[in-house]
Amino acid sequence: MLTFHELIGFMSPKMANQILDDTQANNREVYRALVASIAQAQKMRPLFIGRQPKERRHKNFVQMLSRAGSEEHAGNLIRGWLFKEHKDVLTEFLGKLGIEHEEGMVDELPESIDDGPLNEAVDLLLEKYDRELVAVYLTAFNASNENRWENLDTMLADDERLQLHG
């Protein structure tokens, strides 16, 4: 039952840096918005933050995004990264569950999902993709879902394969 800012705090530094690196390289609009919001929160100019060495800047971003007040920015960053860099994970999960989507975009999710199909879909993702990526995706998916699926929350809390060890 992690929120987006908690997810940033619990993921490995390697994963957090990968998200920021990919976003900086491939989703400049989201990255610029992030720089502007961090600058405003720290009462600095965006130009000053942009001139910091990337390693230091990204470390500061992770610290800021891990705070409760950064939920919206953390959510935008993670969702944007998943849609831009890992659409295949989204489409495979939704497809395995039989949920209609358009390239990972869903108009309406079911209020709940049966355990059997959910377990099969999660097992499929874990067979094909990095364990931490799957945990980040499933956590983000449920955090974005208006009707959180209780069985997915339980699985994220109890299944050792889906634990974040940041």
Question: What positions do the PLM features span?
Answer:
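Charged, amphipathic alpha-helical stretches
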Residues: L2-A33
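Short, aromatic- and cysteine-enriched interfacial helices/patches
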Residues: F4-M11, L47-F48, L97-I99, L162
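Acidic, low-complexity, intrinsically disordered interaction modules
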Residues: A25-N151
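Short acidic DE-rich linear segments
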Residues: E160-G166
